[in-house]
């Protein structure tokens, strides 16, 4: 890989992409308010609502930067770039798909009951995160890409 500014400053590269991604996603949330396609299958109707699912949902958001920084600091630099480039490219392609064909989900319960931390967190999440721009799933893509990075990384080949 050429030794340009981004390769010399991988944290700067991640910060640059983070700002780009958040700006693009914010634009999508503000400008595409009704999906062209509602994504649904009968299996969706069989999945019960579970307010405790917010725990792994929010853990997912910590898992991404943790993995990026872990590979940056512990693994050979090539392992970091083998994660970073496909991850960011896939997220950008997903954003383009959302512009071309907006999708949405209609799976949320009408009301979330309870006053515990989980119910309050779900209500806050529903108020701030629209059920739009869901297919292709960035959550699924990122999870698969991160797991592939762990499986392919040289640091896990060594005996412990």
Predicted regions and their residues:
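Membrane-interface loops
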Residues: 29-43, 73-159
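N-terminal transmembrane-helix/juxtamembrane module of multi-pass inner/ER membrane proteins
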Residues: 1-66, 110
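Hydrophobic alpha-helical transmembrane segments
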Residues: 54-68, 84-92, 142
């Amino acid at each position: 890989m050429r030794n340009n500014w981004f390769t010399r400053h991988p944290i700067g590269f991640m910060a640059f992409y983070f700002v780009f991604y958040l700006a693009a996603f914010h634009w999508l949330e503000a400008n595409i308010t009704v999906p062209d396609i509602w994504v649904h299958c009968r299996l969706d109707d069989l999945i019960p609502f579970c307010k405790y699912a917010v725990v792994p949902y929010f853990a997912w958001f910590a898992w991404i930067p943790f993995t990026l920084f872990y590979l940056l600091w512990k693994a050979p630099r090539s392992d970091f770039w083998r994660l970073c480039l496909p991850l960011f490219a896939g997220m950008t392609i997903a954003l383009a798909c959302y512009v071309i064909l907006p999708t949405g989900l209609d799976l949320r319960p009408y009301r979330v009951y309870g006053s515990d931390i989980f119910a309050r967190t779900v209500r806050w999440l529903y108020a701030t995160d629209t059920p739009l721009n869901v297919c292709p799933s960035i959550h699924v893509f990122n999870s698969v890409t991160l797991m592939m990075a762990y499986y392919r990384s040289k640091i896990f080949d060594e005996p412990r």
